[in-house]
C-alpha cells in the first residue's frame, strides 16, 4: 500500500484493551515458532502492560505501564503528536515489560487513509500477532484519533499574527508576558566591536556582555545563587578584558562562590556526574568536565555542590539503565540569583535567571573576534582549550579552539520558571532539602510579576521549555488528564517533558520568510537507514525537525513564495576529527542534508523551477585564519611533525567551534537554549536540556519587517561572521541576500582552504564544504575530500561498531 504524508497534528487517545490474556499465557507467531522451536512466553511475575503508537516504524508515543491488570488494562491517555511522516498505518503495539526489555503481545493497525478527512475516528481495533493473525480471545484495543492537516493550523505560514499570540500549546510552562531579555553573542563583547545597526523608533542595537553580567549577578546576590551545568570549573576568571576592569574581577569563580556562601548567601550547585571520571579511566573523565575536581574543591565549604547522574527512565531495562546513566548527561546551563530591583532606592529583591549554551567552565571565554593565536599570552594563556588534537597544550602553541556560543538573561515572571526548574531538580537529586524558602522572604523578594508595562516597546513575552523526566525532577502532573494538558508524555514508568522539540516544530511551522539556525549537532536519524542497520523501530523526534524545515521550504516553493533557511554548524563535532564517533556523526549529518535537499529539488523540478537549491537551504561553518604578527606568544615546544596539530599551526587556521543552540524566525521570534537538534537532546529521557522562546509583541513582522532586538541581534551576529554590514542583509528571505551571503561564504572558504594567505581572513562565515548533485545527493566539494590540515573525511563514514544511540 502506498504511503501517505501525514503533515500536521495527530490527536490520539488510547483507552483500553479487552479480553487480554497475559501472565503465563503463550503468545507466539508461526514464524517465531519456526525460528525458536518453542513458544514465546510473556514474562512471569507482575504483568506491566503498556501500549505504543507508531507511524509505520516511527515511534511517536507510549503509554505508562499498567500493573496487575493483565486482562483489561485501561490507560485513558491522550497524545498531541506533531507529525511529518509518510505512513501507511497508525500502529498500536501492546507489550508486557520485563527487566531485560519487553515481550510483544501484539499490534493493531489503523490505515492512515481513514484519518485524511479530518473526522474523529473512535473504534476498537483488532490486535494481531507478527503474522497478522488475531491473537487469542480476539483481543481489541479501543482508540480515538483525529488528524489535523498542517493547512488547518491558523498560524501556518503566517508568523506571529499579533501580540496576543499565546505561545506553544500543551507545555508545562505557559508563556509569560511582561518580561525583559538580554541576548548574548559569545561570553564577552569588547568595546571595539561596534556595529551600527538601526532598530525601529530611531534606536540602535547595543550588545550585552554575558560573563560581565553573570559576574555582577553573583557578586550582588544577597540571598541565593543556584547553578546547574554540564561542567562547572572553579579555576577561571569571568572578567578578562583589561579595558573593562571590575573591582575584584580577577577572582576565580570557585573563590567567588565560596566568598558569597561565607557571606550567608545560599549557594547550591547541580553538576553532571560524569561516570567516566574515575581512576580506572581518568580523573577528569572522557569529557574533561572537572566534576570530581569541582566537588573536591567545595567539600567542607559553605557551597553545596552535588554531582548528579543522569538517571534513566525507571521503566527501562537493566541494560538501558546502565547505558543512559553512563553516556547521557545533564546538559542544562542555568544561573538563578536574587537581584536588586531595576529602580533605585528599593530594598526589595527579585529573581533573575540566565539560560543558554555557555557552561561556567574553561574553554568558553571568547569574543566575536575568535583569535587563534593572539590571545595566547593574555586571556587564553591559562585557559587553553584544544580537544581536537592529541597532546595539545599551551606550551606547544596554537591554534586554540575558538568558541562561539549564545546565552540569555531573563527577567520577570519567566525567571521564576527557571527557578522552579532548579527546585524540581534539587528535590530529586540534591540530597538535603536546603533550598531557600522564598515564602519566608516574601517581604523581601517580590513574587512573580511583570518588569515592563504592556505598552513598553521593549517588553518581551517568554516561554520556558525543557527536555527532562522524573528521573531528574520532582512534581510533574500524575493523572493522564493533567499530563496531556501540560504536553507531557509517558515513559514506561516516568513522566517525560519534550517541550523543546515541540517549540522548534511550532516555530518552524509558523514563519513567513526565513530561518537562521545555529546548532552544534544537526541530525536527522534517517528512519529507513536505521531500520536497515538495526532492523528495529526507532524514535521519531530527531527525524521530525529537519523534515519540518524541508517541508516548510517545499510548501513555499509550491506557493510561489520566497523562503530561506540558513544553518550554521561546526566544521565537525568537537573531538579528534578522524575518530569513529566524529566520522559517524558526520555521516548522519550528510544524510540529514541529503534528505532535505532531495525534498527541495523534487519540489523545484515539479514546479518547473531551475534554481540553485542553496537559494532555499544553505549550510555554513565558522573558521578563522591569522597571519603571524610580531610580538605573538612563542611556545617553548612544538607539536609532533606530520600531525593535524602541526599542519594547523603551520597554516595558521582552525575552525571556530559552533556550540550555539539558537533559531531566529522572521526576525521576530527566537529560541535559545542548551539543546542540539538530535535525538539525545530532544528525547526528554536522555540528556536533560533547557531553552527559552521569546518575542517582542511590539516588534512583529506583520505589515513590515520586524526591527526589534531580535533583528538587531541577528544583524550583529552576521556582522561578527561576515565582517561587514550591508543593506541587503536586512532582508534574509530575499534572493539578493542569500546569494550575497553564499558568495561571501564561498570566497571565505576559498581563502581559508588555500595554500597560503597574505592577510587575516576578512570574516568567519565559511561555506560548509559540500556540493549538491542534481538529484539532491550530497557530495564532496571538488578538491575537498578531507577537512583542511586533517585526514578526516568531510562526508564522514558509517560506524560498524558505534550504535546510533551514541551518535544521534
Curated annotation (Swiss-Prot):
Domain (PLD phosphodiesterase): residue spans on this chain: 326-364, 654-681
Statement: the UniProt record of this protein carries the keyword Repeat: yes
One Pfam family linked to the record: C2
Catalytic activity: a 1,2-diacyl-sn-glycero-3-phosphocholine + H2O = a 1,2-diacyl-sn-glycero-3-phosphate + choline + H(+)
Domain of life: Eukaryota
Gene that this sequence comes from: PLD1
Spans traversing the lipid bilayer: none
Disulfide bonds: none
Active-site residues annotated for this sequence: 331, 333, 338, 659, 661, 666
Function: Hydrolyzes glycerol-phospholipids at the terminal phosphodiesteric bond. Plays an important role in various cellular processes.
Upper classification of the organism: Eukaryota, Viridiplantae, Streptophyta, Embryophyta, Tracheophyta
UniProt domain C2: residue ranges: 1-125
Keyword terms of this UniProt record: Calcium, Hydrolase, Lipid degradation, Lipid metabolism, Metal-binding, Repeat
Family according to the record: Belongs to the phospholipase D family. C2-PLD subfamily.
EC number, as in UniProt: 3.1.4.4
A GO biological-process term: phosphatidylcholine metabolic process
CC per GO annotation: plasma membrane
One MF annotation (Gene Ontology) recorded for this entry: calcium ion binding
Cofactor dependency: Ca(2+)
PROSITE patterns reported in the protein's UniProt record: C2 (PS50004), PLD (PS50035)
CDD domains for this protein: C2_plant_PLD (cd04015)
Binding, Ca(2+): 186, 370, 404, 720
Domain notes: C2 domain is a calcium-binding fold, and the binding promotes the protein association with membranes. A lower affinity toward calcium can be anticipated for PLD alpha due to the absence of two potential calcium ligands.
Class of enzymatic activity (EC top level): hydrolase
Descriptive protein name: Phospholipase D alpha 1
Organism for this UniProt entry: Spuriopimpinella brachycarpa
Residues annotated to bind a 1,2-diacyl-sn-glycero-3-phosphate: 331, 659
Amino acid at each position: 500500500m502506498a504511503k501517505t504524508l501525514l503533515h500536521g497534528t495527530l490527536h490520539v487517545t488510547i483507552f483500553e484493551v479487552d479480553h487480554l490474556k497475559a501472565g503465563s499465557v503463550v503468545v507466539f507467531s508461526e514464524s517465531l515458532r519456526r525460528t525458536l522451536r518453542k513458544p514465546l512466553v510473556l514474562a512471569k511475575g507482575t504483568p506491566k502492560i503498556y501500549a505504543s503508537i507508531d507511524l509505520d516504524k516511527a515511534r511517536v508515543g507510549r503509554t505508562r505501564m499498567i500493573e496487575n491488570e493483565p486482562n483489561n488494562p485501561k490507560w485513558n491517555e491522550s497524545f498531541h503528536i506533531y507529525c511529518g511522516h509518510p505512513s501507511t498505518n497508525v500502529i498500536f503495539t501492546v507489550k508486557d515489560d520485563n527487566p531485560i526489555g519487553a515481550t510483544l503481545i501484539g499490534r493493531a493497525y489503523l490505515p492512515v487513509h481513514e484519518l485524511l478527512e479530518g473526522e474523529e475516528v473512535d473504534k476498537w481495533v483488532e490486535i494481531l500477532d507478527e503474522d497478522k493473525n488475531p491473537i487469542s480471545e480476539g483481543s481489541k484495543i479501543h482508540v480515538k484519533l483525529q488528524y489535523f492537516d498542517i493547512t488547518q493550523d491558523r498560524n501556518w505560514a503566517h508568523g506571529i499574527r499579533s501580540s496576543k499570540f499565546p505561545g506553544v500549546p500543551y507545555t508545562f510552562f505557559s508563556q509569560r508576558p511582561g518580561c525583559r531579555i538580554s541576548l548574548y553573542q559569545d561570553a564577552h563583547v569588547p568595546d571595539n566591536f561596534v556595529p551600527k545597526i538601526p532598530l525601529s523608533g530611531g534606536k540602535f542595537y547595543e550588545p550585552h556582555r554575558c560573563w560581565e553580567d553573570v559576574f555582577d549577578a553573583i557578586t550582588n546576590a544577597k540571598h541565593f545563587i543556584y547553578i546547574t551545568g554540564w561542567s562547572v570549573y572553579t579555576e577561571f576568571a569571568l572578567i578578562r578584558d583589561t579595558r573593562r576592569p571590575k573591582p575584584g574581577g580577577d577572582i576565580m569563580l570557585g573563590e567567588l562562590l565560596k566568598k558569597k556562601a561565607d557571606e550567608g548567601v545560599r549557594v547550591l550547585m547541580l553538576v553532571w556526574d560524569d561516570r567516566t571520571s574515575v581512576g580506572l579511566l581518568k580523573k577528569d573523565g572522557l569529557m574533561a568536565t572537572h566534576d570530581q575536581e569541582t566537588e573536591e574543591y567545595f567539600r567542607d565549604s559553605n557551597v553545596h555542590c552535588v554531582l548528579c547522574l543522569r538517571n534513566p527512565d525507571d521503566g527501562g531495562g537493566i541494560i538501558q539503565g546502565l547505558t543512559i546513566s553512563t553516556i547521557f548527561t545533564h546538559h542544562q546551563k542555568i544561573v538563578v540569583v536574587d537581584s536588586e530591583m531595576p529602580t533605585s532606592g528599593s530594598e526589595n529583591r527579585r529573581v533573575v535567571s540566565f539560560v543558554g549554551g555557555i557552561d561556567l567552565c574553561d574553554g568558553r571565554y571568547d569574543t566575536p573576534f575568535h583569535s587563534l593565536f593572539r590571545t595566547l599570552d593574555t586571556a587564553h594563556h591559562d585557559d587553553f582549550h584544544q580537544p581536537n588534537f592529541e597532546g595539545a597544550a599551551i606550551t606547544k602553541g596554537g591554534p586554540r579552539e575558538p568558541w562561539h556560543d549564545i546565552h540569555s538573561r531573563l527577567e520577570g515572571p519567566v525567571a521564576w520558571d527557571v527557578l522552579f526548574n532548579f527546585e524540581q531538580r534539587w528535590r530529586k537529586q540534591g540530597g538535603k532539602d536546603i533550598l531557600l524558602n522564598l515564602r519566608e522572604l516574601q517581604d523581601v523578594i517580590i513574587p512573580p510579576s511583570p518588569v515592563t508595562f504592556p505598552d513598553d516597546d521593549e517588553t518581551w513575552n517568554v516561554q520556558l521549555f525543557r527536555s527532562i523526566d522524573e528521573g531528574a525532577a520532582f512534581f510533574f502532573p500524575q493523572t493522564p488528564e493533567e499530563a496531556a494538558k501540560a504536553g507531557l508524555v509517558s515513559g514506561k514508568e516516568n513522566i517525560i517533558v519534550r517541550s523543546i522539540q515541540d517549540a522548534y516544530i511550532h516555530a518552524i511551522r509558523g514563519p513567513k520568510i526565513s530561518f537562521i539556525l545555529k546548532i552544534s549537532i544537526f541530525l536527522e536519524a534517517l528512519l529507513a537507514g536505521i531500520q536497515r542497520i538495526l532492523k528495529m523501530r526507532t524514535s521519531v523526534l530527531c527525524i521530525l525537525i529537519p523534515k519540518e524545515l524541508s517541508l516548510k521550504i517545499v510548501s513555499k516553493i509550491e506557493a510561489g513564495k520566497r523562503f530561506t533557511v540558513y544553518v550554521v554548524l561546526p566544521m565537525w563535532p568537537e573531538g579528534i576529527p578522524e575518530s569513529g564517533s566524529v566520522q559517524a556523526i558526520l555521516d548522519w549529518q550528510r544524510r540529514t542534508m541529503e534528505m532535505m535537499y532531495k525534498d527541495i529539488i523534487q519540489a523545484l523540478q515539479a514546479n518547473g523551477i531551475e534554481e540553485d537549491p542553496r537559494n532555499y537551504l544553505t549550510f555554513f561553518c565558522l573558521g578563522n585564519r591569522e597571519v603571524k604578527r610580531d610580538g605573538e606568544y612563542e611556545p617553548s615546544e612544538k607539536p609532533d611533525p606530520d600531525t593535524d596539530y602541526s599542519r594547523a599551526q603551520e597554516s595558521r587556521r582552525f575552525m571556530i567551534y559552533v556550540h550555539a543552540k539558537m533559531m531566529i524566525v522572521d526576525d521576530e521570534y527566537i529560541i535559545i537554549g542548551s539543546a542540539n537538534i538530535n535525538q539525545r537532546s530532544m528525547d526528554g529521557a536522555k540528556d536533560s536540556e533547557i531553552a527559552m522562546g521569546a518575542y517582542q509583541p511590539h516588534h512583529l513582522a506583520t505589515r513590515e519587517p520586524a526591527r526589534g532586538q531580535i533583528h538587531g541581534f541577528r544583524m550583529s551576529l552576521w556582522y561578527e561572521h561576515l565582517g561587514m554590514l550591508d543593506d541587503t542583509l536586512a532582508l534574509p528571505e530575499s534572493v539578493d541576500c542569500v546569494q550575497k551571503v553564499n558568495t561571501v561564504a564561498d570566497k571565505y572558504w576559498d581563502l581559508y582552504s588555500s595554500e597560503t594567505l597574505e592577510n587575516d581572513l576578512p570574516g568567519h562565515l565559511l561555506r560548509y564544504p559540500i556540493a549538491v548533485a542534481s538529484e539532491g545527493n550530497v557530495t564532496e566539494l571538488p578538491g575537498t575530500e578531507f577537512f583542511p590540515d586533517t585526514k578526516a573525511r568531510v562526508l564522514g563514514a558509517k560506524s560498524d561498531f558505534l550504535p546510533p544511540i551514541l551518535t544521534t
